[in-house]
C-alpha cells in the first residue's frame, strides 16, 4: 500500500475519485487527511497552519463516512491524518485501527502519545532526516510501540542517512538533511524501528515512483 497519501481540505470533493484510484492500485488504503494550508508571513515566507477547526472537523466526518462505506463494501480503508505539532518532534502520520477516533492536534509528540496510548493508533514519522526543530525526527522523544516504523524514502528524498544519493532539497524551509535525525541515528540509539517508502505526493495514492509499503 501507499501509507502516505495526503488529501487536503480543498481536495475533499475528489475523495471518491481518490478512493476509486486506490482500489485499482493498492490492496488497502490508509488515507492521511492533511489539515494544513500555506499562509504567508509579513516577510512573504510560507508557513503552514491549521485550517479553521470547524472546516477540518467537517472534513474528518466526511472521511469517516467514506471509510465506513468502503469497509462495509469489502475494501479495507483506515482513517488517519498528518500531525506536525510544533515541528520539534518531526512530522508523523497518525492512523487508527477503528473508525471512531477523534483528530487531535497537541504541540508535542509525548502529548500525542499520551492522547492515543490507550487507543488502537500508530504514529509514523516521515522525512525524518530534516534538521531538528524543522520537522525532522526527534529520536529523544521517540516511543517504539507507538511509532513502530519510519518512512525513509518519499518524494522528499531519502532519510536513511545524510550521505545517500537521493538528497532532500525539495523543501528548503525544512532542510537541510542531517545525520542527527536520520533513520540510522534511531537504530544507533537502540530502537527497533522498521522502514517503509511512501508517496507523500499530495495528489493521489500509490504513485509508485516514490515507493510503497509491503505488508
Describe the residue ranges of each PLM region.
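Extended, charged catalytic domains and RNA/DNA-binding interfaces, predominantly
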Residues: 1-215
Amino acid at each position: 500500500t501507499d501509507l502516505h497519501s495526503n488529501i487536503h481540505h480543498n481536495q475533499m470533493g475528489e475523495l471518491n475519485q481518490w478512493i476509486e484510484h486506490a482500489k485499482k492500485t493498492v490492496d488497502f488504503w490508509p488515507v492521511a487527511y492533511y489539515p494544513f494550508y500555506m499562509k504567508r508571513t509579513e516577510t512573504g515566507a510560507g508557513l503552514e497552519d491549521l485550517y479553521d477547526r470547524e472546516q477540518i472537523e467537517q472534513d474528518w466526518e466526511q472521511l469517516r463516512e467514506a471509510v465506513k462505506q468502503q469497509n462495509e463494501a469489502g475494501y479495507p480503508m483506515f482513517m488517519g491524518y498528518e500531525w506536525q505539532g510544533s515541528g520539534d518532534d518531526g512530522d508523523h502520520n497518525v492512523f487508527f485501527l477503528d473508525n471512531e477516533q477523534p483528530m487531535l492536534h497537541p504541540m508535542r509528540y509525548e502529548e500525542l502519545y499520551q492522547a492515543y496510548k490507550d487507543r488502537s493508533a500508530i504514529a509514523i514519522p516521515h522525512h525524518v532526516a530534516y534538521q531538528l526543530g524543522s520537522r525532522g525526527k526527534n529520536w529523544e522523544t521517540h516511543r517504539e510501540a507507538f511509532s513502530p516504523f519510519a518512512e525513509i524514502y518519499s518524494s522528499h528524498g531519502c532519510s536513511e542517512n545524510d550521505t545517500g544519493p537521493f538528497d532532500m532539497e525539495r523543501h528548503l524551509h525544512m532542510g537541510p538533511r542531517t545525520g542527527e535525525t536520520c533513520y540510522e541515528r534511531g537504530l544507533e540509539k537502540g530502537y527497533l524501528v522498521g522502514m517503509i517508502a511512501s508517496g507523500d505526493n499530495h495528489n493521489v495514492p500509490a504513485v509508485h515512483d516514490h515507493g510503497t509499503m509491503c505488508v
